[in-house]
Amino acid sequence: MVRFENIGFRYGLGPEILRDISFALAPGSLHFLTGSSDAGKSSLLKLIYLAAKPSRGLITLFGRDTATTPRRDLPALRRRVGVVFQEFRLLHHLSAFDNVALPLRVAGTRENDIRKHVAELLGWVGLANHMNARPTTLSGGQQQRVAIARAVIARPKLLLADEPTGNVDDRMALRLMHLFEELNKLGTTIVIATHNESLVKRLGLPCLRLDDGQLEIGASAPNRAAMAAASGAGGLAKPAVDAAAGRPRENAV
């Protein structure tokens, strides 16, 4: 799915902020990406998304060497990736509903199905009463949930989430993590960047840790029982992302 081999990355002519990064993400896996606020987590996600180029090394995405992939083919690769940026990048002239519906409309989904799935998902993230609101009228936490819903609505092959629980309370954080878990069960490979160590320890998922520009790979196994218990404690039902299920889950490692 994703492979980094001896990747280095710098901004401009500055020193490398990521050095000798090597790892592989198997299809269907779910990992935390942790480290301090200046560890380079966002930069690593941008490299995976092809929003930045490495200063050295090899990146393979969906089996393709990104350095030799023609520029005209890069947008098609990016469309297979859902991204939640810290900046949210919502379209302010569209409602929350239309922001979330956008990936489905681009994919040619029937309007009746769009209305059903978007309304269901916005309800799951606590925005049932804000579907017609413009992003500028929403709080930071509400905008973040719109961005998350937009990123997951089309069930991407790969989801990159940069601090997706940074603007919500603990209960909503667990609710969102349960949403990611259900998406992962449908086969989506997921990387969640966070500096919330308590959340990482509570859920016990495999962990990629950045420290001083270098990567450490945690050996802990996925703790699905902890995830289910944490979600169940809040009386949560299965999230709406499962509504259009049909793709079997690939084995995670």
PLM region spans:
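Catalytic Walker B motif of ABC-type/P-loop ATPase nucleotide-binding domains
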Residues: L159-D162
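Conserved catalytic motifs of ABC-family nucleotide-binding domains
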Residues: R155
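Short coil-to-helix segment of the ABC ATPase nucleotide-binding domain corresponding to the Q-loop/switch region
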Residues: L94-L102
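Helix-to-loop junction immediately C-terminal to a conserved catalytic motif
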Residues: Y49
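Conserved ABC transporter NBD signature motif
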Residues: G57-D65
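ABC ATPase NBD coupling module
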Residues: T66-G82, E111, L183-K185
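Conserved ABC ATPase signature
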Residues: R134-L138, Q142-Q144
